[in-house]
Regions:
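Acidic low-complexity intrinsically disordered regions
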Residues: 3-106, 110-118, 129, 134-135, ...
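Short alpha-helix capping/helix-loop boundary micro-motifs
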Residues: 121-129, 205-206
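P-loop NTP-binding catalytic core
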Residues: 133, 145-221
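Conserved glycine(s) of the Walker
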Residues: 228
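Hydrophobic positions on the alpha1 helix immediately C-terminal to the Walker A/P-loop
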Residues: 232, 236
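P-loop NTPase catalytic core
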Residues: 237-239, 249-472
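Conserved SF1/SF2 helicase motif Ia
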Residues: 243-247
């Protein structure tokens, strides 16, 4: 038994000695390998200087060969691309025209009017900045024609604009140097828009006497319901088209009846822009904003533009519905923030110092029984420089044109009135000032009917005044 234990201890001792010796040999081998690697690196550093020249020459030769191979491959690819493009049919482009509507992060070319439509063309903000496009610009460009078998709305809702040929009738380079509307100098109206056309058109003749209109006028037609404001606007539009054909006439109808829109389109020789009452309030505001921006772009080119708006009250109502609530509510339920966009619209009217003018004549509703309409009118009451008031009493008695002579007038009318006629008009004003609206109407209108023109009417007043003086 003791002998077996001694043998076991001896075997364990021999195993331990073998493991220790093997570990020493492994460590010794690793040290030798590291030393050999260090020797090799040292030898390489010593001999590198001799090999650098040969390696550099070889590297340059290799690079030249690789560049030559790459050039040959590129030439072959270019020839293949040219052959492919020559064989392929060229992409067809379709001309397109419309009004630019710039939104927050993109823009559209409205091709079917001033409202959004399915055929509108998408314009990126990069193109807007590149070409200097502004809201209201009239552009002519081109889009890609749909390929054979490709449906319009197959991949994208709106077709992108490919190129622009002209902006407002000018080249793209010329459009870059046009002035900005906000930097133009406004003045009082100095050139008259004559309203007199024929002897039987008493509305225009009466307006020329009591409330003359000039280029750059900012006027309000204050009217109760059923007093003839729409007919008055039609007469003003037709008179401007007849006497001043150089003026660009725009009639903006907001929240109106469809039949009135049709009647206006058939009777007015101008651009009629409308949004009927069956459309949402956002469409009313969109039409008004794009129309006034279009007018500004024309004024920047030195043109005379007249905008007839029917009505400012309905436009303010639409903004009150469509604009986000500010939390500040005026009497009648009018949001204070909703009145700023209509004021911006109305305030754009001005006579430009070095040519061009923007005239805005808008109607405003009163005596409707709505507190909101009263608040809206009071906000715009002092902003205009011309006011034409229509009388409910005269309209109820079917006395048309139902113009309240004493309540109507124009600021600085001496700038647009003939100096020879001005003293006569002042004398007539003093004569009619003490009369009631109906008496003033019955005094003035029958005498107008007896004469063919306002000049004859003025001459008759002078003659009558001279006879009265001689008689005394």
């Amino acid at each position: 038994m003791y002998k077996r234990q001694d043998d076991k201890r001896r075997d364990e001792t021999e195993d331990n000695e073998y493991r220790h010796s093997r570990g020493r040999n492994d460590r010794r081998g690793r040290r030798m390998r590291v030393r050999d690697r260090d020797y090799d690196e040292r030898d390489e550093r010593r001999g590198r200087g001799d090999r650098n020249d040969r390696n550099d020459r070889n590297d340059r030769a290799d690079r030249m060969d690789r560049n030559a191979d790459r050039d040959q491959r590129n030439d072959r690819m270019d020839r293949a691309d040219r052959d492919q493009h020559r064989d392929e049919p060229k992409e067809d482009l379709v001309p397109v025209a419309g009004i630019v509507d710039v939104l927050d992060s993109y823009a559209f070319v409205r091709t079917s009017g001033y409202l959004p439509g399915p055929n509108d063309v998408y314009v990126s903000m990069g193109q807007v900045k590149k070409y200097g496009l502004r809201k209201g610009d009239a552009v002519h460009g081109s889009i890609r024609a749909p390929r054979e078998g490709e449906r319009r709305n197959q991949r994208q809702k709106f077709v992108p604009l490919q190129s622009i040929d002209s902006i407002n009738g000018m080249s793209v380079e010329e459009a870059q140097h046009r002035p900005q509307f906000s930097k133009l100098t406004p003045l009082y109206p100095q050139e008259r828009l004559k309203q007199e056309t024929t002897p039987n058109k008493l509305t225009g003749r009466l307006i020329d006497i009591v409330a003359p209109i000039g280029k750059g006028q900012r006027g309000l037609i204050v009217s109760p319901p059923k007093a003839g404001k729409t007919i008055t606007l039609q007469n003003i539009a037709n008179a401007i088209a007849t006497n001043n054909p150089e003026v660009h006439l725009m009639v903006v109808l907001v929240d109106e009846r469809p039949e009135e829109v049709t009647d206006m389109e058939r009777t007015v020789q101008g651009e009629v822009i409308s949004s009927t009452f069956d459309r949402p309030a956002s469409d009313h505001t969109t039409v008004a904003e794009l129309a006034i921006e279009r007018a500004k772009r024309l004024v920047e080119l030195g043109q005379d533009v007249v905008v007839l708006l029917d009505s400012m009250t309905r436009l303010a109502r639409a903004y009150n519905i469509a604009a986000p609530a500010s939390g500040r509510i005026l009497s009648g339920g009018v949001d204070a923030q909703a009145l700023y966009p209509p004021k911006k619209f109305f305030g754009a009217a001005r006579n430009i110092e070095n040519g061009g003018s923007l005239t805005i004549i808008s109607s405003a509703l009163v005596e409707t029984g709505s507190k909101m309409d009263e608040v809206i009118f009071e906000e715009f009451k002092g902003t205009g420089n011309m006011e034409l008031r229509l009388s409910r009493e005269l309209a109820d008695k079917r006395l048309f044109p139902a113009i309240d002579v004493n309540a109507s007038g124009t600021r600085r009318e001496e700038l647009i009135t003939d100096p020879q006629e001005l003293p006569i008009i002042y004398r007539l004003r003093r004569l009619l000032g003490g009369l009631e609206p109906e008496q003033a109407y019955q005094t003035l209108v029958p005498r107008l009917k007896k004469t063919a023109t306002n000049r004859d009417f003025m001459a008759s007043l002078i003659q009558q005044s001279g006879n009265a003086t001689n008689g005394n």
